[in-house]
């Protein structure tokens, strides 16, 4: 028998292919494996209900096929209190939050971890995230997933080394096509299911309609950086820096046919500022200040250091220098200007394959425009 035969792992089963294959891989490694389906949202229309019901049915079908038990739990109250209300408050303040990061912090690696350990007697939890864990000198590190296209460490930077030590990430060592191939070989119902792209647990729905249910939209003007009125927006909360689609405005004589991009939001006047060209100076930043810091090793940063940073998911690594301002904030200076650095989003730091941690972008340092 393997050393793992006495260890119980609870896999967060989403009804997707990654968690399905994770469960199978853990069985192959000799663990005692069971699944947990988390219900984190109280559906309020038929379409949402059907989507959630399909995910649960798929998770159950996979567990039946693999001969393992599936537990269910309702974390809707925790999700509302600890993720959704903060998400709405950030939008209301004109920032663009990342709910997946909050959800991982508060639900998957807190509520789920506690429930699995205390109620189900788990030694570990496991998820279908594309990240890797490395244990060095008694501390667990978070590494990027092997598949660079799918690496999800950006979403998990808030985890501590203690949380990582209680977590397993079986597909983090694989590339996505291999995961699908395993699912097809096993004839799992999730083998060809497309990856979800919706907001965390809120699923695939029209974001504008969804946000409009909870926050009153305030239409206002769309102005160019030169002060020209070019259109009307339906609410600042529907727009984010660097956004190109959905503005409903064409080119101008001076700017030619270059597409328009959102370069700023003026909350005081409820104005959306736009400029033409994806590298317009108003869109570029030379650095940022990050707050609400989380370092994976939980050691505060006391001296400047060099690393790379990502200011959004799947962005290329940006070489930078990080300087602590105090225990809660760091100053980050990029080697070269970066487009669309967005307050409310996360800045996540890496050294090589290791995810060091990150923080919320509080402000950006704009590229100064020559007079």
Swiss-Prot record:
Residues 98-100 are annotated as: Interaction with target base in tRNA. Disulfide bonds join 103-200. Its EC number is 2.8.1.13. Its main location: cytoplasm. Gene3D superfamilies: Adenine nucleotide alpha hydrolases-like domains (2.30.30.280), HUPs (3.40.50.620), Translation factors (2.40.30.10). The active site is at 103 (nucleophile), 200 (cysteine persulfide intermediate). Pfam families: tRNA_Me_trans, tRNA_Me_trans_C, tRNA_Me_trans_M. GO terms for cellular component: cytoplasm. One of its GO terms (molecular function) is tRNA-uridine 2-sulfurtransferase activity. The keyword Glycoprotein does not apply. It catalyses: S-sulfanyl-L-cysteinyl-[protein] + uridine(34) in tRNA + AH2 + ATP = 2-thiouridine(34) in tRNA + L-cysteinyl-[protein] + A + AMP + diphosphate + H(+). ATP binds at residues 12-19, 38, 128. One of its GO terms (biological process) is tRNA wobble position uridine thiolation. Keywords: ATP-binding, Cytoplasm, Disulfide bond, Nucleotide-binding, RNA-binding, Transferase, tRNA processing, tRNA-binding. InterPro entries: MnmA-like (IPR004506), MnmA-like_C (IPR046885), MnmA-like_central (IPR046884), MnmA-like_central_sf (IPR023382), Rossmann-like_a/b/a_fold (IPR014729). Residues 150-152, 312-313 are annotated as: Interaction with tRNA. HAMAP family: tRNA_thiouridyl_MnmA. Catalyzes the 2-thiolation of uridine at the wobble position (U34) of tRNA(Lys), tRNA(Glu) and tRNA(Gln), leading to the formation of s(2)U34, the first step of tRNA-mnm(5)s(2)U34 synthesis. Sulfur is provided by IscS, via a sulfur-relay system. Binds ATP and its substrate tRNAs. Interacts with TusE. Belongs to the MnmA/TRMU family. This is tRNA-specific 2-thiouridylase MnmA. It comes from Yersinia pseudotuberculosis serotype O:1b (strain IP 31758). The gene is mnmA.
């Amino acid at each position: 028998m393997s050393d793992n035969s006495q260890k119980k792992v609870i896999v967060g089963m989403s009804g997707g292919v990654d968690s399905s294959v994770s469960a199978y891989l853990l069985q192959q490694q000799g663990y005692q494996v069971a699944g947990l389906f988390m219900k984190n949202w109280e559906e309020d229309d038929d379409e949402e209900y059907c989507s959630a019901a399909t995910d649960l049915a798929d998770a159950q079908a996979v567990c039946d096929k693999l001969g393992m038990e599936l537990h269910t739990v309702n974390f809707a109250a925790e999700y509302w209190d600890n993720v959704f209300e903060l998400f709405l408050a950030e939008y209301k303040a004109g920032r663009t939050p990342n709910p997946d990061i909050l959800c991982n912090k508060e639900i998957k690696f807190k509520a789920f971890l506690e429930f699995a350990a205390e109620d189900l007697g788990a030694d570990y939890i496991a998820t279908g995230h594309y990240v890797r864990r490395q244990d060095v000198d008694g501390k667990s590190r978070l590494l990027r997933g092997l598949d660079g296209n799918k690496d999800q460490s950006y979403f998990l930077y808030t985890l501590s080394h203690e949380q990582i030590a209680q977590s397993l990430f079986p597909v983090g060592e694989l590339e996505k096509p291999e995961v699908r191939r395993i699912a097809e070989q096993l004839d799992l119902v999730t083998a060809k299911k497309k990856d979800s792209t919706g907001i965390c647990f809120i699923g695939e729905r029209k974001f504008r309609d969804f946000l409009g249910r909870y926050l009153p939209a305030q239409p206002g003007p769309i102005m160019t950086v030169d002060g020209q009125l070019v259109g009307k927006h339906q609410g600042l909360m529907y727009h984010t820096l660097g956004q190109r689609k959905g503005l409903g405005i064409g080119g101008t004589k001076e700017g030619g046919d270059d597409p328009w991009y959102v370069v700023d939001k003026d909350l005081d006047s409820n104005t959306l500022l736009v400029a033409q060209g994806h590298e317009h100076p108003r869109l570029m930043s030379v650095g940022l200040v990050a707050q609400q810091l989380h370092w994976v090793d939980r050691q505060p940063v006391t001296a400047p250091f060099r690393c790379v940073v990502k200011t959004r998911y799947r962005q290329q690594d940006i070489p930078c220098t990080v300087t602590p301002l105090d225990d809660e904030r760091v100053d980050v200076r990029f080697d070269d200007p970066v487009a669309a650095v967005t307050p409310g989003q996360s800045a996540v730091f890496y050294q090589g394959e290791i995810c060091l941690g990150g923080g919320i972008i509080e402000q950006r340092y704009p590229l100064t425009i020559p007079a």
